[in-house]
UniProtKB/Swiss-Prot annotation:
Keywords: Aminoacyl-tRNA synthetase, ATP-binding, Cytoplasm, Ligase, Magnesium, Metal-binding, Nucleotide-binding, Protein biosynthesis. This is Phenylalanine--tRNA ligase alpha subunit. Its EC number is 6.1.1.20. Pfam families: Phe_tRNA-synt_N, tRNA-synt_2d. It comes from Legionella pneumophila (strain Paris). GO terms for cellular component: cytoplasm. InterPro entries: aa-tRNA-synth_II, aa-tRNA-synth_II/BPL/LPL, Phe-tRNA-synth_IIc_asu, Phe-tRNA_ligase_II_N, Phe_tRNA_ligase_alpha1_bac, Phenylalanyl-tRNA_Synthase, tRNA-bd_arm. It comes from the Bacteria. It is found in: Cytoplasm.
Amino acid sequence: MLVLINTIQEQASEAIKQATDIVALEQIRVDFLGKKGKLTELLKGLANLSAEEKPKVGQLVNQAKQGISALIETKMIELKEKQLLAKLAAEQIDVTLPGRNHSTGSLHPVTQVKHRINDYFSRLGFDIVEGPEIETEFYNFEALNIPGHHPARAMHDTFYFGDGRLLRTHTSPVQIRTMEQRKPPFRLIAPGRVYRCDSDVTHTPMFHQVEGLLIDKQATLAGLKGLLQDFFAYFFGRELALRFRPSYFPFTEPSAEVDIECTQCNGKGCRSCKFTGWLEVLGCGMVHPNVLIAVNIDPNEYHGWAFGMGMDRLAMLYYGIDDLRMLFENDLTFLRQF
């Protein structure tokens, strides 16, 4: 029995030395120490031995089992180290290679247009003011000379809330709130999001607008015209012809709509301007006396002018975009151009 135990130990030791990977080593463990392994079979045979031989043989088998387990554990550590070194060698990183930069984003074209507008007017001393997008009918309509029965309200397809509040249809409410809080003279612009029930190639339910306001004792329509001529020359980088057409807005009197020379054909006529040579860009006029009275400003002492234009419309003209909806579809392929 002693010879058999020694033979099994030698076989196990040799097999462990020859093992080249963890799978082979695990198979050796099963062959010698598993439920049907060689040493396990010896332990099962103790029942056939005499009472005197059982303790001695059992002790020898357990010693052999411990010795083989120790050899397997040592070999396992060795194989794992080799496996790790092989993996590191295969996955070696060349630290001298240049890194990969993350793609850099850019400002949305409408945001870029907003910044250009803000830069221009802030240099002229205009304050940039903002206000709530959820408004009351007073600030959105009534204070702007648009009472409940006024037919001009039909011009605004408005988003109403159940409690009578609404999504503002222009940024004019910001001007009303500012005039309530400040004493003239002052000048300001109010950029922001506005909302109307409209959606097509040139309209979206939400769009961006900027309105300007100046209240002074000597405000004139001629001064407004000169300012707008200078602004569009700055914005488009060249002098453009302007055309003022008489119009009607409840909050200004007189009122005008302003066209600029087509930026695509230089006024010669093309599809962009519907072959007229002109592009409509804004509405303006002298602030109506009723608007001044609504905010406790004496119209006999102070006068003012106001204008409003769509920033999305300016972005389309500046960048040559045909469909307004492209600005809001979050298409990175399109937006990366800017």
